[in-house]
Amino acid sequence: MVLSWLFGAGAVFDAYVLAFRIPNLARELFAEGALASAFIPTFTRCLTTQGKEEARTLAGISASMIFLITGAFTALGIVFAPLFVNLFAPGFHDVPGKFELAVLLMRIMFPFLVFLALAAQAQGTLFASHRFGIAAVSPALFNIVSVLSGLALGYWFGAATGLSAVRGMAIGVVIGGAAQLGVQLPSVWRAGFGWRPKWNLRANLRNDGVRHILWLMGPAMIGNASGQINVLVTTNFAAGLRDAAGNVMNGPVSWLAYAYRFFALPLGIFGVAIASAALPSISRSAAQNNFAEFRDTLSRSVSMILLLTIPSAVGLAVFGERMIGLVYQHGRFHASDTHETALALTCYAVGLAGYAVLKLIAPAFYTLGDSRTPMMVSIASIVVNGLTAFTMIRFTGLGHAGLALAASAVSTFSAVTLLILIRPRIGGINGRALAVSALKITAAAAVMGVVCRIAGAYFPSKVGGLLMGIPAGIASFWMAATALRIAELREATRLVVSKLGLRA
């Protein structure tokens, strides 16, 4: 909301989006993606089989190496920022000052990679120790501190600091990363895993746990980064979209970015949360060769993800334009921007369940010591995404919305493929029960969609439609799911209540 009010959907925000996405790709390579996927299973196995002292040593060595590796990547990113911008958004040269602004902002924001990579390692340590509170809310702190500090530096006190609003927001991203790390460190120490930095590289590489993490991280960097690579492919196409007169458009990159922010909310609350909570249990089952428990935990978690994300996707599609208008349509963000962003959000929502399942299923392979399978599927998804995006732009006329739809199709393809491939590894995934559950959830979500449409028609205002439509949609889904006897409903209700802070 703050960014839309300050920058709208034009050249400045296009530059900001691209400048953020390149270091965010590196973040996905080292932080929430590859590092978490490799570190949590290895740390859990070490804690389970070798004890707390060895796990503490592994945590200290890992933190030291993460600092060195991400520090080196940050330095390279700052030096080669012009090359990255030219590679992923060559169309920026056609708008005076847009290319130079993107380079400057990227150089400012790249250091947040170091903080967030260390924060991801701290989060993995806490999850493996069954300490979910601070670790679960720390990503939200990143967003809050980034916005508030950015506003303070570039807007509220811009005259005193000499910073423009967009530069202030870029610096705020780095401060937010430091806050996400800092808030978790006391909990890490209380858990008994306080970091003891170890800088002897040769000795560090002799540690079995470190070698196992590095062995998993190579393919995992490709596997987990595929989503961000696909986003960059989408950005490349969007940055080159032209209007009827043949001029490069200002707006498509911003519309997709604003839509993805809304899309990421249920993805983070439900998909990432369920995956993060389930992964330590799955890792322990794999370490103990208890594949019956592994299979049950995985199947139950996938069902939970579907139960929460399918109705969320329907809600985004039905109420997307109202929500975007209410939150974003201020200052330089106009009604036309609201409409274009809502189109992209609807297309992203199609793939919400696929995106969320991927957050669980790819790391599940790493707990089995198999990093090759998700890597190969990810490589295939990058190719499929590029071809699908090209087809959408060239033949459908959907523009930026077609790019969002291509991304959704690819995420669903990847999730389904990985689910099929993991079946023989663990003796099945309770596929029949999972399919029946998915059909029931889809039917209940369809009922919810009809009710939401009716409620929206009776209350045409943005606020009125949302205040009446969302509760009506939730109630209708719950009643339909109860009537269809969806087994995961009770557990999902407890999760939602907990995430809303209504119980400890």
What are these regions (language model features)?
Residues 1-504:
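Membrane-embedded alpha-helical bundles of multi-pass transporters/translocases
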